[in-house]
Amino acid sequence: MIFQYRTNNLNIMKRQISAAIGLVCLLFAAACSSDSNSPYGTYVNPVLAGDYPDPSIVRDGEDYYMTHSSFDYNPGLVVWHSRDLVNWEPISYALQEYLGSVWAPDISMRDGKFYIYFTVHGRGNFVVYADSPYGPWSEPHDLHVGQIDPCIAVAEDGTKWLFLSGGQRIRLTEDGLDTVPGTLEKVYAGWPIPEDWITEGLALEGPKVRKIGPWWYFIAAEGGTAGPPTSHMVAIARSKSVDGPWEDSPYNPLVHTYSRDDRWWSRGHGSLIDTPDGRWYIVYHSYENGYYNLGRQTLLEPVELGEDGWFHPLGKNIVEGELPAPLPLQSYDRKSRLGEFRIGLDWKYYKDFDASRASVQNGTLTLKAAGQSPADAAPLLFVAGDHAYEFEVEIDRDPTASAGLVLYYNSTYYIGEGIGPRGTMRFRRDKGGVRQRMQDVTHIWLRLRNDRQVVSAYYSLDGKEWHKDDWGIEVSGYNHNVFHEFQSLLPGLVAIGEGEVKFSNFKYRTLDSE
């Protein structure tokens, strides 16, 4: 058994005083070096707006690859590519089938292959691999170990370890595709959170263990991923060996929300990443104050690796303003291709799905109808990430099918507008109503508007003259702290009943949210 190194209270106080002095110097240096005259311009957070939780990142030369928890959305584990750490493009997805709720992946690269270790809630931990981040990806391999949030670390002698939640680790087989029975052990107790901080508890999760220079670093998520605004954080410890003992940083936490007045709440679950010239950043997730139902968004923040061998934060709230771009910026509008209906890259189903239901040709999505309501029809969804937006689509439905637009949290909580054999309808849990009008209409345009949490619906018979429907709803409560499940409120399309529905001329617009 390996135990964490603990200092006494006096040593802790000395380290904290020393850390405070060092931090003042670092902040002064950062202020001088982080002006808006960066040769690459500036960026603002989030770098991925909307529900992109538990980011894990790896660098291959000048290319960066990142993935996130996919939870109950499928296809799962979308892999993103960037060359500037700010603009990201989806390039593949690692999971072809629904395994369950997929949590906290860890993407890594070794021996010319890419690996993603991940948790399936209630089933354990798995791994997939590929020769290229563009895929194709292997079938999932069961690692035969419980816990959550796996992360691989390869020791100097080639021994492979899988670090897990609760400060535990287990040895992996030589190929990294299974675990060695009887080797599970607890190696780290976590950074002790101050008693007066308001969190969800210790919740020692999201380990990222890697060697940088002479040190091994244990980056951990603590405090709980949701709950109060000040819950989450990133703590860090180090050791001369992957076997420990682990010494907590005097600068902890590296990332944290200190006030409910901050823009970004529950900041945590971070991964360190460097640039080719040796500058360091951390990617992590956070809820946005006032827009909790957007989910946990991906943020990027510079950090400093000091001469003392510790990673230092450069300020408590630098993430809220403009920051110098790490690298030459390359623009990419991830919503510009929504009209192509790229399922798996831009669009995803909720839970299980039958891929044969969907076909795309010349910008028209043909979707076979299924289920009795949005609850069991596996709606096709996308991430918006904006405070105010609207989306619309032209619909041609078979007389036996219903079709519509939704804002979807899960199979119990959703809102939307549709049309079917009985006329126009409002989707809302089991309380949706049929308007008993336009029963014979099979060709229609529908629009949903989400203007800073207030949702309204519109329809048109010619795509030019629009009519507002007679309902509206406020949706800020559609979030994890109310409904659980770690989901977000996603816009999308649904086809219900029997027959087919054709969706075409899809349009998405960001509205002025000021």
Model-derived regions: residue spans:
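Aromatic (phenylalanine/tyrosine) cluster motif
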Residues: 3-5, 28
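Bacterial N-terminal signal peptides that target proteins for export
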Residues: 8-21
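Intrinsic low-complexity/disordered segments
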Residues: 1-2, 13
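Bacterial N-terminal signal peptides
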Residues: 20-29
